[in-house]
Regions:
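Histidine-centered beta-alpha loop that forms part of the nucleotide-sugar donor binding/catalytic region
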Residues: 5-7, 84
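Catalytic helix-loop patch of NAD(P)-dependent Rossmann-fold dehydrogenases
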Residues: 9-52, 57
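NAD(P)-dependent short-chain dehydrogenase/reductase
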Residues: 40-87, 93-94, 100-101
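Mid/C-terminal beta-alpha module of Rossmann-like enzyme folds, strongest
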Residues: 98, 105-123
Length: 123
């Protein structure tokens, strides 16, 4: 089974990236709590699973932060965004390819999946 989760299972207050098997959960909202509940249910029920935590997803279709910022930049002389968030964007095409590759293995467990190694700050 593949369960798509989120970085929202953590509180975002760490100084270093969380390891995939980290159990220091601290969801800050209902979305994070519900995804954590799903993760725990999968891990307690199944032996063979991929729990894949993703963040800042963007792609060609649908709404996302990058498209929104491009639209704002076209229509406004100045763009303002929060500057207290750090994350690593995840491109949908790359995520889909990785998920297909993962399912062809038996390397079950928890995974943090984003593009690149360095976090992206919104300022």
């Amino acid at each position: 089974m593949v369960y798509i989760s989120t970085d929202y299972v953590f509180d975002g207050q760490g100084e270093t990236p969380w390891e995939p098997d980290c159990k220091d959960y601290a969801p800050l909202n209902v979305y994070g709590q519900s995804k954590l509940g799903g993760e725990l249910a999968v891990a307690q029920t199944l032996e063979k699973y991929f729990i894949v935590r993703i963040a800042w997803v963007f792609g060609l279709n649908g709404k996302n932060f990058i498209k929104t910022m491009l639209k704002v930049a076209k229509n406004h002389p100045q763009v303002r965004v929060v500057n207290d968030q750090i994350g690593t964007p995840t491109y949908t095409y790359d995520l889909a390819r990785l998920l297909v590759d993962m399912m062809e293995t038996e390397k079950y467990g928890y995974y943090h999946v984003t593009n690149g190694n360095l976090p992206f700050r919104t300022n």
